[in-house]
A protein has these predicted regions:
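Non-transmembrane "mature" sequence context
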Residues: 1-117
Length: 117
């Protein structure tokens, strides 16, 4: 379960929105295209902010994979990565997830690359 307050979409809803089967969703988690979290009840899901409306329907937030990879390389667990994404960072003056959804992924990734444990 994540320690930050976020809206979580259940995995079946994510699969429906993306038009994929659950096994493909698991691959997206492994490839760090999406990140899996648990809601308050312990059910698996995906943060709502990382599924966005694209030109061809719903899709994973395009800039998320690079950031998740950097955070994993820095030693972050999935839960730590979610906490970092959803907590205001002084260097950004906002939450990294907000910067990513606004197209400022270069700045987010520059900061993420300095976070190695």
């Amino acid at each position: 379960m994540t320690s930050v307050d976020i809206t979580v979409l259940p995995t079946d809803e994510v699969c429906r929105l993306l038009g994929i089967e659950e096994r493909r969703l698991k691959q997206l988690f492994r490839d760090r295209v999406l990140i899996e979290v648990r809601d308050g009840s312990g059910a698996r899901g995906v943060p709502q902010d990382v599924i966005v409306k694209g030109d061809n329907g719903w899709e994973p937030l395009p800039s998320l994979q690079g950031t998740l990879t950097l955070l994993a390389d820095d030693g972050f667990t999935a839960e730590e990565a979610v906490a970092w994404l959803y907590t205001v960072q002084d260097e950004l003056g906002e939450r990294p997830i907000d910067a990513l959804t606004s197209g400022r992924h270069h700045r987010v990734n520059r900061i993420a690359s300095t976070l190695a444990f």
